[in-house]
Amino acid sequence: MDKKITIAQIKEVAQQAYDLYKTNTDGKNADYIPYLANINKNLFGISICLLNGQTIEVGDSEYRFGIESVSKVHTAILVLRQYGAKELLEKIGADATGLPFNSIIAILLENDHPSTPLVNAGAITACSMVKPVGDSKQKWDAIVANITDLCGSAPQLIDELYKSESATNFNNRSIAWLLKNYNRIYDDPDMSLDLYTRQCSLGITAKQLSVAAATVANLGLNPVTKKQVFDAELSPKITSMISTVGFYEHTGDWLYTSGIPAKTGVGGGVMGVLPGQFGISAFAPPIDQAGNSVKAQLAIKYVMNKLGLNVFNGHRVTIVD
């Protein structure tokens, strides 16, 4: 079935979503990371990046917030770029754990691999794999350059967030050294954890994340900069991982109700990929008990359902002026 949607319709629906949910008071800021606890809880932004490079923005789409776990997608892409899909599967894996994002039990249950680069254990392993192994500065430069390629503009380290996370990341320290015990980390554990903590502390905007999502939706071609960031055949690999674990143990419910693969972070950001159509991101600091932004979820679901879009419905969708 063919379906046409106008850019005006997308703008209208995005504005409706913003107006509908901007006063929602459900959820609360992440309180286990001091910096995040103090962010203005009323911030709310939506951005959609079309594959022609046009962005549709509503609300606080240019506010720079902590990227947190959404960064796992970016570093997974970097590992895919440097090693290829086969080696990522062998060294990390692509299975959903069905457990919370910071689970230590998942490592004990599947000690032969960390399961997926989109949970903490796999993301720390991914940071350990980033080349050149053994050189923290060059690894960090590669991580930032990759995010810049995907987003079309550079992120900025939020130093206060980095210090806040570094002082409270006891669980992740346990994960890093447990991975070492099972020979599933490929560089110094403390260095790898520090890189992971730093990448989670990068400041990003909803607009930047929508461009990154559109780059994935556009088979690795950044629609804004026109740069081929990664090989087209890697796009289904990363999208499939987002589909299965983007919302951790609640991914099934999310995909069932929204129809779009998306990755979430406790900083309040959600980044969704609709292959061949657009990237969408929403941001609002209050999160639910699973660590997912309440308003960002509601907004993206509204846009998808109101426009009748779903990654599984088989429609041939054309977006027109």
Swiss-Prot record:
One of its GO terms (molecular function) is glutaminase activity. Keywords: Hydrolase. One of its GO terms (biological process) is glutamine catabolic process. Substrate binds at residues 69, 120, 165, 172, 196, 248, 266. InterPro entries: Beta-lactam/transpept-like, Glutaminase. The keyword Glycosyltransferase does not apply. It catalyses: L-glutamine + H2O = L-glutamate + NH4(+). It comes from the Bacteria. Belongs to the glutaminase family. NCBIfam families: Gln_ase, PRK12356.1. This is Glutaminase. It comes from Parabacteroides distasonis (strain ATCC 8503 / DSM 20701 / CIP 104284 / JCM 5825 / NCTC 11152). The lineage of its organism: Bacteria, Pseudomonadati, Bacteroidota, Bacteroidia, Bacteroidales. The gene is glsA.
